[in-house]
């Protein structure tokens, strides 16, 4: 066995031993205390001596925003750091009762306008929208290597969608469904010169087109890598690749994106997917791909240019790594990229400066590897500080491993040096982690969050379904110190810590905002001004009800419609007081929506039940809140 092969592979015995241990540990629910060995457990009963405190006193503000994914809940959660207090939830792929997301016309437009034709047809008898989502990997937009406060992007693994959230109003304004690929797992955004592209991994392999004509012919299955234009929210291009794509990241020069891959065997069962000792990362040459699109070197599939990036393509390179790598994370020095081994106890470090020579065929794929330290069992994701250190989650060991990149490179060259600085027990089984400003050139090395998949005994027992456990770790000193445990409902997959100076939300909607422009246009067509209108307009069996709201009264205290009319209610909050949100709910009609200061919200429904139906303000906005109500009178159909 050559030295290169020795460094890049696990032996069959090592691989099966690791896999068996993973399975046994998972089955028995072993926690970090049993697996940690001689590692340090550094729990803080408050702030460590000389360390930082998570306390934010009443009336004071957190230093950072944390944008948490929620997995199968389908929303984004905003948390303050270091307090770890939940501040707000942004509904995206889910149906939200409080705000009316998924019910209001404005939200339904966002949820439906980006659907693929076949799914639009599929959903016709299912309420026209997907009722579930699996939101992963929320990442803010960049300009010149740091967050610019414009947008947040995330992916939906359940229904192959990508969303964009406006950070000025903290609302989702665009959702698109990706053609040709099957699910999205792994999303990152272009860091330089700006976002730019949103890179999306197609995890599962399916036939293209996926129309049932090749159900069991796995040779027709393909995985797709997608670049979405983050400004237009249209697919810019796609690349067909070998294997299943997992996670993705990109460089700080705007030249390359790279994805981890499992199932290089292209199997359909667990045993088949694990049969090889190696998988790979795929490196995408952005300039060459853009030239391919410009020169027509692609096949158009479902209206999108699809480039062949399988083995042998000039647009991609495949670098072998140990079996089933998971996370891939670019270091803040702009040079190094770390692929995390998952089934291997190692992480693989690449030097992006070598990728030019790799694509020019001047070096072999493994020549781009500059380190491959062994850290522990189940490395999944890596974060960074401002001192050249990396922090890798070890799922099976229930630990965070702090290690030094330069020392790992020295060890790879044969020096007798240990790159590991510390191992910290976390509670329990960490997946993603993230450091403060840790994906930007402005990383500050203060805080790390470990998103742990199990909480076990950390909280009061709440029944069989238990919360996740997000642990806040002080990394400002030489030693990592846990300073806070925070429970999360199902189920965070990644989080991003952004300094508050980068985000500048408004407190009032602008009346010129495009979010409710359709309502403004309809009112104008009816000869009305939404800021003043309190009228009912009938157009055949379609009725449009316009009303203002100013606490504690709606502009209309009653309106009359006929049974089976299609009713659209437009409510405009004309209050100019910060934090004075109104609601509009109709009793026993399944209607409720949020109406923020200076915003218009609308809802359309069929008045199928005759009778008297009270509507009321569902958000507490005034001492006379209970009296802020009115009547919808539905006249029965004439015999």
Curated annotation (Swiss-Prot):
One Pfam short name? COX2
Q: Where in the cell is it found?
A: Periplasm
What CDD domains is this protein classified in?
N2OR_C
Binding residue positions for Cu cation A1: 582, 617, 621, 628
Task: Please indicate which superkingdom the organism of origin belongs to.
Answer: Bacteria
- Please give the Gene Ontology molecular function terms for this protein: calcium ion binding; copper ion binding; cytochrome-c oxidase activity; nitrous-oxide reductase activity
Q: Which residues form a coiled coil?
A: none
Quote the cofactor binding remark.
Answer: Binds 2 calcium ions per subunit.
Can you state which reaction this protein catalyses?
N2 + 2 Fe(III)-[cytochrome c] + H2O = nitrous oxide + 2 Fe(II)-[cytochrome c] + 2 H(+)
Please state what class of enzyme this protein is: oxidoreductase
InterPro entries, per this entry? Answer: CcO_II-like_C (IPR002429), Cupredoxin (IPR008972), N2O_reductase_N (IPR011045), N2OR_C (IPR034205), NO_Rdtase (IPR023644), Nos_propeller (IPR041114), NOS_propeller_2 (IPR041142), NosZ/Cyto_c_oxidase_sub2 (IPR051403)
Stated family: Belongs to the NosZ family.
Q: Which HAMAP family match?
A: NosZ (MF_00716)
| Protein name in UniProt | Nitrous-oxide reductase
Q: Which organism is it from?
A: Brucella melitensis biotype 1 (strain ATCC 23456 / CCUG 17765 / NCTC 10094 / 16M)
